[in-house]
Amino acid sequence: MTSLGRKVFCGNLLGMVVFLLTSAFGWAGSPGDLKPRVPPERLEEAQSFQNPFTPSDAIIAKGKKLYEGKAFCSACHGLEGAGGRSGGRLTPPGAQPPTNFADAAWQAARTDGEMFWILKHGSHGTDMAPYMPLYLSEDEAWQIVTYIRMFGDM
């Protein structure tokens, strides 16, 4: 093997090792995950939105059904809401990993209104697209927000 061939081989091997390690151990997240995803000029408005639903078995069941079905949240965030690469089927390589809804720090940092705003407008700089009114009604979005809050209790 030539010197150049060895360098190419070692570079490819190193790339595979990094890929396998990040795949095996998942995405740990970063402090940036806690920064608001709503633009600063809209944050106060988003935080003022109030969830009209009180958590109940019926509302949580509706939110779960939407999360796992019609809104296909679980395709990226996973059935357990762990985000990272746990769901990942729709997350392209190199993209920002989906939010970990089960993270206590994230649950404390994010208001229901911010989550609702993201469902309505999407999240700039991520693969999170807007879902209202194309896929979800406002009530359905709030039901999903209510369900996402349950990940913080698991």
Identify the role of each PLM range:
Residues 58-82, 88-91:
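Sequence/structural segment immediately N-terminal to covalent heme-attachment motifs in c-type
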Residues 17, 51-52, 62-65, 104, ...:
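Generic anion/oxyanion-binding catalytic loop in active/binding sites
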